[in-house]
Amino acid sequence: MDINEWEGWYVEILEDFGFSREGDEKTADLLDKILEEKGCLTIGDLYNEVVYTKKKDTDKFIIFGAGPSLKKHIEIIKNYNLDNYVLIAADGATTALLEEDIIPDIIATDVDGKISDLLTANANGAYFVIHGHGNNEENIEMWTDSFNKVLGTTQSIPVGNLYNFGGFTDGDRAMYLAIELGANEMVLAGMDFGTIVTKYSRPDIEGETGPADEIKTKKLIYAERLLNWILENTDVNVINLIDS
């Protein structure tokens, strides 16, 4: 999705959630400054190092969300030849993958997941796409320097080293990242778009699952709409395991 197309979505999201464009831009500037000082990846670097070199120029991707179906879908995916797929995890899904001894190739995160697991995945080779927005300035400042192999994104107009490929939540941003990296086939695991959340997306809940709050429910509605945009406007073959 190009930035002009995204702008319409972005304005709607700002109005619907009461978010601040200025807050997003402030955090984007902070993330860009940190990455400028520490060094960061370009989208070309990410493609060359992960898609082209590590995964032999595959055009197949698996996107892992943190929905209730995630563990069931991981069991299905264990039967795939994962050498043929780029694995992109949305933030909290990383924990579930580590529990099954799977290291994602790329993690899309706004750094609000289980930090110890994110650091473990990074130390074991996972690349990071770190997203700055108005509500995570503190996490960006605290944790960005702790990660290696980082590409930065924003949901506002890109500045400096940052990109905006489209997408709002970690899961749908992972989908749009896959498209930017050349996806022709995209398997979705743990992408439920429902009203139930898991401990992987909300570590503070009691038990394995719980009801999504109003904000989370609205975010998941946008995530599903953004998936539908992909289905309607691209030629990517999307296989959602929730339908299997």
Q: Model features per residue range: what roles?
A:
Residues 152, 186-190, 238-242:
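A structural signal for short, well-ordered beta-strand segments and their strand-loop junctions
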Residues 63-68, 170, 185-199:
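Glycine-rich anion-binding loop/nest that anchors nucleotide
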Residues 2-6, 10, 40-124:
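Metabolite-binding pocket within alpha/beta catalytic cores that recognizes anionic/polar moieties
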Residues 1-61, 71-76, 205-210, 216-244:
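N-terminal donor/sugar-recognition subdomains of glycan-related enzymes
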Residues 178, 190-193, 227-234:
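Short leucine-rich amphipathic alpha-helical surface patches
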Residues 58-65, 78, 156-163, 208-209:
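Short, basic, glycine/proline-bearing loop/turn elements
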Residues 85-86, 94-184:
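Acidic/Gly/His-enriched mid-domain segments of enzyme catalytic cores or analogous surface patches
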Residues 193-212:
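Phosphate/ribose-phosphate-bearing ligand recognition and processing surfaces
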